[in-house]
Amino acid sequence: MRDIAVQATKEFSSLSVEPLLGDDSASSGFVCSLFDVLDFSIQDFVDREEEFAFTMAQYTELEGEKNTGQGLMCLATTDAHVEERWGEGYIKRKYGVHGLNSIWDEWGPDSGILPCPVYLRHCVLSAGRKGGEEGVAYRSFVEETFLADRKTTIEEHLARRPEIMLMEPPASVLGRYSG
């Protein structure tokens, strides 16, 4: 689990998108950072991010000519989907050594799962890369992204845990998780 998870406090979740249910779903959206996958192919990226489902999502740039396009988005999924993709018993083989029997199905709103602190810091820094803490991407991320409990925003979580933003990633992920 990349040597950054904190199992004792269930701080090992990553970040994904899931559908918004209800009346507002047709007009909903969020602001995110786009990045090019230059060092390897999209297939390499999909293989690395093994625990997700993926979709191509429409986007509109906020600045300049407001170009539109499509980008690959990581989606929440199910244990069955992961096992279908990687083979029966994959979760047990890969994550069982860490004491986990599930990647998705056991981690609902009442599970107590929290974001991996080093990864969360990386996401927050990335969101603020353009515009800082007052930038639209940063504000959208901290105000419109929720923990697994579906109630607590990233902003509220960081207010309770400000030390997260002071954590340095270990050498094994320093370049990748530095915002």
Describe each model-derived feature in a short phrase.
Residues M1-G179:
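Glycine-aromatic micro-motifs
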